């Protein structure tokens, strides 16, 4: 009797411990994913803050510029364009976690701003009716060193689209264009002939967007674009850190292997106590060990999948989810024995009560162990082992009391 009780004790401890190990493992995985998600959120929030600060500073700068009427009615948009190009580019870089690349010079000299070490001159002009290219030629003649130092000219985005359309267009194609488009094609070709080495790039905004009456709306749209990118990055972070089928399958496989190993090991120990030494095992013994191992693999797979789904879909704590699965196994096992006629209804009820109580104690003790010993895995396992041992001590009188209630004669008034 004592041997059987000892076997039952270490078997229950091994069973509940490996069950809670699965729960602790899944809980740790979930914690790692959650911590990574929070880390990414923090980084994205910093990116957004940097971008918004850049745009808010731009709005204040533009307000002062307009109030001072710098450049007058015909030239103010040029100064606005410089600031918008610099700030928008830096805000977009901030949203991607990059350093500021643009720096405003603002000295009315050869260079309007820098992009790293690259010199940039902005030409946002319509007075020449040639996309500002006439002003580019004039600047290159005044500052020949600008192109020699690999300087770049930037024109409004809508101007650049027209420039790109005409710059490589063949003459026979151009001759089929409308009169105004043909005129523009000729101006672009004249520009390329005059300064073939000039590099032209688009600004991030159009000519109309940098006018004094429209620039605040332009900044508002960029603010909205920052918010949109912020949401996009948060969604990407959530998708990268969410539970996946692949991870669930890995957890299921690990749980199956663990439970199969534990149940197989327990079965070997039980047979060893009966046979003395492993070399004395008979064919039937190994068959039973194989069956026990296979059952463990099956239960482990079910447990791993169920706990992973419960913690990530229903957000049930891993310890409780694992204990619930253990209790369910106990209910199924005792019900199956009753259906097969291997036990009485009373024995079935007692077995189910025992399984559920054991699972509840395992869940509670595991949670207490995790809280009082905040070391991943170790706290949960120590708590579970201690709880299981205490339950074994208290179980006998509890089951005797439960049994006496079931055997009591009903009182008839």
Region roles according to the model:
Residues 409-413:
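Intrinsically disordered, low-complexity N-proximal targeting/linker segments that flank membranes
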Residues 1-79:
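Interdomain/boundary linker segments immediately adjacent to catalytic/signaling cores
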Residues 277-281:
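Charged, low-complexity interaction regions
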Residues 245-269, 286-339, 345-406:
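Membrane-active amphipathic alpha-helices enriched in small hydrophobic residues
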Residues 54-140:
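Catalytic centers of nucleases
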Residues 120, 127, 156, 206, ...:
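Helix N-cap and loop-to-helix transition residues
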């Amino acid at each position: 009797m004592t041997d059987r009780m000892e076997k039952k004790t270490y078997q229950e401890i091994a069973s509940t411990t490996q069950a809670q190990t699965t729960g602790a493992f899944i809980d740790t995985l979930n914690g790692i994913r959650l911590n990574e998600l929070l880390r990414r959120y923090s980084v994205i929030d910093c990116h957004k803050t940097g971008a918004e600060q850049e745009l808010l500073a731009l709005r204040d700068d533009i307000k002062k510029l307009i109030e001072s009427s710098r450049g007058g009615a015909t030239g103010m948009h040029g100064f606005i364009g410089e600031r918008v190009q610099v700030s928008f580019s830096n805000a977009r870089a901030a949203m991607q976690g990059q350093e500021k690349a643009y720096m405003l010079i603002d000295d009315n000299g050869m260079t309007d701003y820098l992009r790293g070490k690259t010199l940039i001159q902005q030409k946002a002009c319509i007075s020449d009716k040639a996309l500002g290219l006439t002003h580019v030629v004039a600047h290159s003649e005044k500052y020949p060193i600008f192109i020699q130092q690999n300087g770049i000219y930037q024109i409004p985005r809508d101007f650049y689209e027209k420039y790109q359309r005409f710059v490589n267009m063949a003459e026979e194609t151009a001759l089929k264009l409308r009169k105004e488009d043909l005129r523009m094609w000729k101006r672009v070709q004249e520009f390329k002939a005059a300064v073939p080495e000039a590099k032209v790039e688009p600004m991030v905004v159009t000519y109309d967007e940098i006018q004094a009456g429209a620039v605040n709306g332009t900044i508002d749209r960029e603010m909205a674009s920052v918010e949109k990118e912020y949401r996009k990055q948060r969604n990407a972070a959530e998708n990268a850190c969410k539970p996946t089928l692949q991870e669930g399958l890995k957890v299921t496989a690990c749980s199956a292997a663990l439970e199969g190993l534990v149940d197989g090991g327990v079965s070997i120990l039980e047979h060893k106590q009966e046979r003395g030494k492993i070399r004395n095992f008979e064919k039937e013994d190994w068959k039973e060990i194989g069956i026990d191992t296979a059952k463990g693999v099956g239960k482990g797979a079910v447990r791993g999948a169920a706990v992973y789904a419960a913690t990530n879909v229903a957000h049930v704590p891993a310890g409780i989810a694992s204990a619930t699965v253990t209790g369910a196994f106990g209910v199924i096992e005792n019900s199956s024995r009753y259906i097969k006629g291997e036990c009485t209804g009373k024995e079935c009820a007692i077995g189910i009560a025992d399984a559920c109580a054991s699972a509840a104690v395992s869940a509670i003790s595991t949670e207490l162990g995790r809280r009082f010993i905040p070391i991943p895995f170790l706290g949960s396992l120590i708590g579970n082992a201690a709880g299981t041992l205490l339950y074994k001590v208290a179980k006998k009188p509890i089951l005797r009391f439960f049994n006496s209630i079931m055997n009591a004669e009903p009182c008839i008034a």
